[in-house]
Amino acid sequence: MARNILQMALPMTVAQLINILYNIVDRMYLGRLPGHLSLTGLGLCLPIISILMGFANLCGMGGAPLCSIHRGKGENEEAERILGNSFTLLLLFGGGLTVFCLAFRRPILYLFGASDLTFPYANDYLTIYLLGTLFVMIGLGMNPFNNAQGFSRMGMMTVALGAAVNIVLDPIFIFALDMGVRGAALATVLAQGCSALWVLKFLTGRRALLRLRWNTLRLQAARVRRILALGTSGFVMSMTNSLVQVLCNASLQHYGGDLYVGVMTVINSIREVVSMPVQGITNGCQPVLGYNYGAGEYERVRRGIRFTTVLTVGYSVAAWALVMAVPELLIRIFNDEPELIAAGIPAFRLYFAAFFCMSFQFIGQSVFVGLGRSRSAVFFSLLRKAFIVAPLTLLLPGLGMGVDGVFAAEPVSNVLGGLACLLTMYVTVYRRLGR
């Protein structure tokens, strides 16, 4: 069981690493421009990007586990229909979101914490990025179906192709062509287009076990409900992440100004990198757990949960120790402005104080999603972000903590939300499977 999980998790972890580089390489390059306004402007776009990714996860992470479960039962025709319906949903969401966000981008950006200084940078980036929304939907939303069929290396290549294109084009567009944030956005859109074409080529080709076919694209209400119900967990997590980013940026803008919005952009970038292996391992276990659960191999599911828990927690503790030891070194990867570093180091240590507890949330969530328990997955997605982090982000700064209150909300939520999710999974899933 451990070998099966690692066979899925290692390529997915590499894919997650590449995907993180894909997402943060813009920030690394823009951080090298004079000042911090370009980096801050990009940071203001991140909540909107999280929303777009949330809709992609709604379809991809909702449909892919269902495909694994039906494959385990030998029901490949139904698995293909889920694949086709998920693709149609991605197209519909992508088109609607593009029109809406382009029409209302100015009020949205100011609502999300933009100032008159940072709005031009955020607007330039977002306008171009939104033109590639369909590419984001297809590349991110359809790639989990590669993993659901056991082609985790192909899933890794989808991400690797986009990342390579982005890394190569970024310095050309940003510096050589002097396009600044517009160049970063254009490079990202072209990279996402390459990823989308790659994943479509595979899923319509002969190698795929489950193919994307014309006769599976017509939406069927019951099937759509199942996809959306299971995908709601990933969707809610992305939405609540976006909500927290908005509240953080707005609070930091109020209590600390543009500088602290830039600090949070750097912190979020580092968090994405260090949490990447946790996401790779827990995402990698989902198709294995789902397949064995569908086949009735409950003891193998229990062994998979044990292995995933030990591996994930072990990594998280080691990563936490490293992060707390060298904050300045990590911050300088993105920006070396003395003012930002001076403000960033104490904020960094406060934000990451209980980082290792975040792995508990990922473990519980992955088990719930992998076994098709959508209600539990949705509840714990909401609990940590919407019911703990968001209120604390508003409450603590007003109690005299200022910007420190914004950063302190994260470790509190990691402990409370993470433990609640892990313990509930143990009682309601792990123990019951052993009976």
Role assignments for model-derived ranges:
Residues 17, 21-40, 109-116, 172-179, ...:
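Helix-terminus/linker motif at the lipid-water interface of multi-pass membrane proteins
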Residues 51-54, 166-171, 196-200, 272-276, ...:
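Hydrophobic transmembrane alpha-helices of multi-pass small-molecule transporters
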Residues 60, 129-147, 155-163, 184-197, ...:
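Short runs within selected transmembrane alpha-helices of multi-pass transporters and secretion channels
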Residues 7-26, 128, 162, 191-195, ...:
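Transmembrane helical elements of multi-pass membrane transporters/channels
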Residues 1-9, 67-134, 176-232, 289-354, ...:
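Short alpha-helical transmembrane segments in multi-pass integral membrane proteins
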Residues 34-47, 122, 126, 185, ...:
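Small-residue hotspots at the loop-to-helix junctions and early N-terminal turns
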Residues 39-99, 136-155, 249, 263-321, ...:
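Small-residue-rich hydrophobic transmembrane alpha-helices
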Residues 1-28, 32-33, 47-62, 66, ...:
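N-terminal transmembrane alpha-helices
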